[in-house]
């Protein structure tokens, strides 16, 4: 009896001690703020609508982007050298189930190339493709990039001194990647470079426009972006019209909105197929800088100054790009864990809501790091396939999906003059349109849905008007 009583007392003491831990980890929906963010005017075009369909994204960080490690015996060990765990379909399924519709897969290619032509290892390429397929099979969108490849010797480096080797690297690597994925549809997006910058320079992380080295670097980035676009387009197949992402200096908001940055030209017929790539951990002392390095864990959702730390760069992006119908994706954002869950929930909810109001997509940076004093950007525990901070994710999902937007426009296929009817006037207009020497792609004229407007569409429209085809496509 005494042993039984002692056991029960011991059990109760342990159970009572665990209660605070259980309560501390209990889900708290009340942390998610109720926001009313005024919606900006968003142009209606294919590029903007495409990005809208991506909804919300998640980064498979510290995985294929790893370029060193202590336990690497074969090249596939790079995948686990930083995160410690191999990517599985179960992980991607959990990401999809939580509400993410896009996965960005950062890849560092330079440890896996050989020879003067930068031949990519088939073993590495096959494994990357396998994980891409995990996402594609879930009907998710995928962004594939070149990540930690900014290197004077092994990769590319955006300065005039290294432009010859940089151009060769970018064109060689992207020709191979594009060829491998040429038959993938628009669910796969290519991102030419990740945070291109002058590594080791005093202005590595800030585009100081009074510095001639920085201006030279921006001009080189412009050229490398153009080389990337030209290379991918030249491989043909679905790459001829694939959506592509291009960054400015260090992929910062200022890098993309300064007067020296130029978006690359695209081939005729591609309208708004080039997406501006931006990374923004703003304000950095809260979102990215660890407490041990002088960061802060404070950010007040009701303070106008703190709000402006988010809205200033989004307004700049909106004014230069999305308000003009040029799509933008924030490929990396987030807030490191500083034992400040409530603040991070409010910050990420506010961040996504403000971006959504401006037609900008957000992709959460997740490096699977949950301990220590550094960049604790871990959100999804890849071993348990559970989100450690579900309130943060649910806040992001809430405002990525529920922000007030105009309804998708009704597309009347074959309606050349946009009067709501399809008749002989539209046939005459489409015929004249096709005979023009150079014409842009117009979605509602593509009546056979092959991503081209040509004589085949005219023939189908004729059959429809003659009663030989019962109906045209609809959205």
UniProtKB/Swiss-Prot annotation:
It catalyses: Endohydrolysis of (1->4)-beta-D-glucosidic linkages in cellulose, lichenin and cereal beta-D-glucans. GO terms for cellular component: cell surface; extracellular region. Residues 409-474 form the Dockerin domain. One of its GO terms (biological process) is cellulose catabolic process. It comes from the Bacteria. GO terms for molecular function: beta-glucosidase activity; cellulase activity. The C-terminus (AA 411-475) may play a role in organizing the cellulosome complex. The biological conversion of cellulose to glucose generally requires three types of hydrolytic enzymes: (1) Endoglucanases which cut internal beta-1,4-glucosidic bonds; (2) Exocellobiohydrolases that cut the disaccharide cellobiose from the non-reducing end of the cellulose polymer chain; (3) Beta-1,4-glucosidases which hydrolyze the cellobiose and other short cello-oligosaccharides to glucose. This is Endoglucanase A. It comes from Ruminiclostridium cellulolyticum (strain ATCC 35319 / DSM 5812 / JCM 6584 / H10). The gene is celCCA.
């Amino acid at each position: 009896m005494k042993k039984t009583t002692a056991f029960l007392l011991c059990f109760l003491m342990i159970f009572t001690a665990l209660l605070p831990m259980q309560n501390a980890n209990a889900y708290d929906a009340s942390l998610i703020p109720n926001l009313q963010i005024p919606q900006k005017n968003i142009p209606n075009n294919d590029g903007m609508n495409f990005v809208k369909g991506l909804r919300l994204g998640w980064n498979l960080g510290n995985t294929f982007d790893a370029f060193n490690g202590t336990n690497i015996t074969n090249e596939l060990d790079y995948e686990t050298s930083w995160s410690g765990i191999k990517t599985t379909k179960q992980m991607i399924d959990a990401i999809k189930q939580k509400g993410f519709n896009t996965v960005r897969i950062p890849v560092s290619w330079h440890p896996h190339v050989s020879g003067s032509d930068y031949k990519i290892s088939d073993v590495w390429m096959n494994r990357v493709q396998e994980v891409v397929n995990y996402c594609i099979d879930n009907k998710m969108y995928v962004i594939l990039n070149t990540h930690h490849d900014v290197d004077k010797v092994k990769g590319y480096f955006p300065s005039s001194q290294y432009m010859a080797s940089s151009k060769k690297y970018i064109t060689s690597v992207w020709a191979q990647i594009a060829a491998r994925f040429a038959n993938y549809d628009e669910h796969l997006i290519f991102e030419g470079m990740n945070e291109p910058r002058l590594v080791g320079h005093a202005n590595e992380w800030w585009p100081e426009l009074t510095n001639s080295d920085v201006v030279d670097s921006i001009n080189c980035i412009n050229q490398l972006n153009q080389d990337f676009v030209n290379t991918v387009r030249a491989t043909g197949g679905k790459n001829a019209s694939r959506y592509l992402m291009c960054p400015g200096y260090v992929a910062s908001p200022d890098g993309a909105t300064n007067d020296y940055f130029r978006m690359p030209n695209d081939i005729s017929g591609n309208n708004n197929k080039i997406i501006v790539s931006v990374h923004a951990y703003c304000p950095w002392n809260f979102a990215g800088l660890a407490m041990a390095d002088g960061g802060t864990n404070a950010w007040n959702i009701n303070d106008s100054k703190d709000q402006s730390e988010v809205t200033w760069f989004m307004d700049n992006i909106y004014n230069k790009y999305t308000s003009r119908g040029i799509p933008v994706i924030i490929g990396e954002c987030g807030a490191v864990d500083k034992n400040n869950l409530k603040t991070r929930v409010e910050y990420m909810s506010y961040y996504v809501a403000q971006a959504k109001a401006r037609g900008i997509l957000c992709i959460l940076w997740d490096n699977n790091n949950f301990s220590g004093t550094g960049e604790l950007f871990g959100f999804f525990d890849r071993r348990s396939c559970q989100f450690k901070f579900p309130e943060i994710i649910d806040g992001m999902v809430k405002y990525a999906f529920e922000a007030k937007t105009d309804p998708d426009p009704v597309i009347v296929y074959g309606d050349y003059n946009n009067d709501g009817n399809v008749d002989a006037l539209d046939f005459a207009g489409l015929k004249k349109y096709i005979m023009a020497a150079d014409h842009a792609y117009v979605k509602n004229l593509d009546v056979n849905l092959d991503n081209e407007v040509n004589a085949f569409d005219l023939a189908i429209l004729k059959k429809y008007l003659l009663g030989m085809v019962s109906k045209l496509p609809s959205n």
